[in-house]
Amino acid sequence: MSAANDKLPDILQDAVLKASVPVPDDFVQVKGIDYSAATATDMRASDLVNSMKTMGFQASSLGKACDIIDEMRSWRGKHIDELDEHDRKGQFDDAGYQKTTVFMGYTSNLISSGLRETLRYLVQHKMVDALVATAGGIEEDIIKCLAPTYLGEFSLEGKSLRDQGMNRIGNLLVPNDNYCKFEEWIVPIFDKMLEEQEEYVAKHGKDCLDANTDVDSPIWTPSKLIDRLGKEINDESSVLYWAHKNKIPIFCPAITDGSIGDMLFFHTFKASPKQIRLDIVADIRKINSMSMEASKAGMIILGGGLIKHHIANACLMRNGADYAVYINTGQEFDGSDAGARPDEAVSWGKIKAEAKSVKIYADVTIVFPLIVAATFANGKPLPKN
């Protein structure tokens, strides 16, 4: 206490002028960006994010997410030649070293938005190993190959839009004609898939019951259906196209919860009494096996709900992910899975206690392009690990 305050009552000295303990040496000072500095002019994304690490609040979480993603991408284990035959599982880099298996999940609205191009870039360049999406995240990717989505306003009146045949997704507009084009495109594919399925069943009988026995067989699973759509669309703007081309599985356990579900429903009337059958059990075995075989597992979760939990639950099968980055606006006060912080997943064994993890409370369309620019697309060699 300074001499100027030595006449204050003791209660004020104790309450208002309470002394601090010494600050530990490892404390980081809060510091923002000095835009008067020459280095701040036309700053690279990676430099901007690095400067934001000491800013506090969600800016610091964004910086931490970039560090986690860099470590997730750069980790390397043993060379495949050092491993016994039964241990040669999981993902390997081009030089033959073990690397992290990266699971990325995203909700349908992100494909409806311009984030689709960012997600496509990651799949095109094999920067992720498995995807989990909602049904809308599948169909909207295809629909955008057939017709565009437009910018609108959040405030547009629903009744007026309905009268015009315009569907609103936030401040995006999708003409209903787009879904009619989607139906015209997908029904012949369903016809062909049903024909292939029935021919295979007739030929193989009981031997065709296991969808995992022959990954190329027309015993369909949601991921096989999605792969087929990626093959058929044959459009380089599509996430599904690049996932098919690069053999990156896309899992969608709620494949019927969207326009694809409508089309499958309509197709049952056309094809009755036959119908396309999708084996969801084969897909849960596939994604859980990918997790169990991973040398290390990383999660990048864009949004919440089904896509978040499906990846986290797969990582439970290996006693937790090693890296986790969540980006969503969900709050935990209502007990929702979307709102839960990574530490809640630790309690379930879905993220390891010693894992590197962070949650960014933000709109994914704002922060994820910046994260990708600062990490996956920064043009620099991977940090050595």
From Swiss-Prot:
NAD(+) binds at residues 108-112, 134-136, 140, 257, 304, 329-330, 363-364. Keywords: Hypusine biosynthesis, NAD, Transferase. InterPro entries: Deoxyhypusine_synthase, Deoxyhypusine_synthase_sf, DHS-like_NAD/FAD-binding_dom. It holds the Pfam family DS. One of its GO terms (molecular function) is deoxyhypusine synthase activity. The keyword Amino-acid biosynthesis does not apply. One of its GO terms (cellular component) is cytoplasm. Its cofactor is NAD(+). Spermidine binds at residues 139-140, 262, 309, 335-337, 344-350. The keyword Transferase applies. The active site is at residue 350. Pathway: Protein modification; eIF5A hypusination. It catalyses: [eIF5A protein]-L-lysine + spermidine = [eIF5A protein]-deoxyhypusine + propane-1,3-diamine. Belongs to the deoxyhypusine synthase family. This is Deoxyhypusine synthase. It comes from Candida glabrata (strain ATCC 2001 / BCRC 20586 / JCM 3761 / NBRC 0622 / NRRL Y-65 / CBS 138) (Yeast). The lineage of its organism: Eukaryota, Fungi, Dikarya, Ascomycota, Saccharomycotina.
